[in-house]
């Protein structure tokens, strides 16, 4: 199975310049369009390259995003679409940035905070809580919370669950890698997903499935 490699760098550029840009629609070109495309790729709505040209694929992705988020699905990126998209991207960035900030923290069985150290599910629960998202405490319960996501739609910020029954969890970062607090004697670290027995994917933000 090949993982979708997501365009993470685009999300780091979204700021006031993007927020203040004019309407974007089919036929628009330039840096704002490229930024928009990068964020749609990041959120799983666009399976294409970010080339700065607002064509049919970008329009379809925008319509899909709007429809899924209770907006008028006109394919035009105005203030409402831009604001909702920005909020979702910033939320995902917050989750990933928080997770990365604990790289190197020692594993602690039963640990649920930076002060004590984390076990695997204590780590994921704490990271999501910092973004205002409440998830269960233990890995097997986390694996049945949120919304199930197929492997083909895996994106950054998703909870990745391992083994059967589920006994380990982490947070997907993109590019085939995830962050987790692995085991006693180890530390919070980034690991390639291909080395793990992935059995479930759950999503708690900006649900897009099917």
What do these predicted regions represent?
Residues 103-156:
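Catalytic cysteine-centered active-site loop
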Residues 75-77, 153-154, 166:
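Short glycine/proline-centered loop/turn elements that form peptide/ligand docking sites
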Residues 1-49, 88-93:
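Acidic, Ser/Thr/Pro/Gly-enriched interdomain connector segments
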Residues 23-34, 38-83, 136, 172:
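Short acidic, glycine/serine/threonine-rich helix-capping segments at coil-helix boundaries
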Residues 133, 139-149, 166, 173-210:
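Aromatic- and glycine-rich peptidoglycan recognition patches
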Residues 33, 37, 59, 82, ...:
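Extracytoplasmic/secreted envelope proteins and their assembly/folding machinery
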């Amino acid at each position: 199975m090949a993982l979708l490699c997501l365009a993470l760098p685009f999300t780091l550029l979204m700021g006031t310049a993007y927020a203040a840009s004019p309407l974007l629609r089919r036929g628009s070109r330039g840096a704002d369009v490229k930024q928009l495309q990068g964020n749609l790729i990041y959120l799983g709505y666009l399976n294409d390259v970010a080339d700065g040209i607002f064509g049919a694929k970008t329009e379809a992705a925008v319509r899909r995003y709007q429809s899924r988020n209770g907006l008028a699905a006109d394919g035009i990126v105005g203030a409402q679409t831009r604001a909702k998209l920005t909020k979702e991207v910033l939320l995902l960035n917050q989750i990933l940035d928080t997770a990365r900030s604990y790289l190197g923290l020692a594993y602690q069985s039963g640990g649920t905070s930076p002060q004590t150290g984390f076990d695997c599910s204590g780590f994921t629960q704490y990271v999501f809580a910092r973004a205002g998202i409440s998830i269960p405490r233990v890995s097997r319960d986390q694996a049945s919370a949120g919304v199930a996501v197929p492997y083909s739609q895996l994106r950054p910020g998703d909870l990745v669950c391992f083994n059967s029954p589920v006994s380990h969890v982490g947070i997907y970062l993109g590019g085939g890698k995830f962050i987790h607090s692995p085991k006693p004697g180890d530390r919070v670290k980034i690991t390639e997903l291909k080395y793990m027995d992935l059995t479930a994917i759950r999503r708690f933000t900006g649900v897009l499935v099917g």
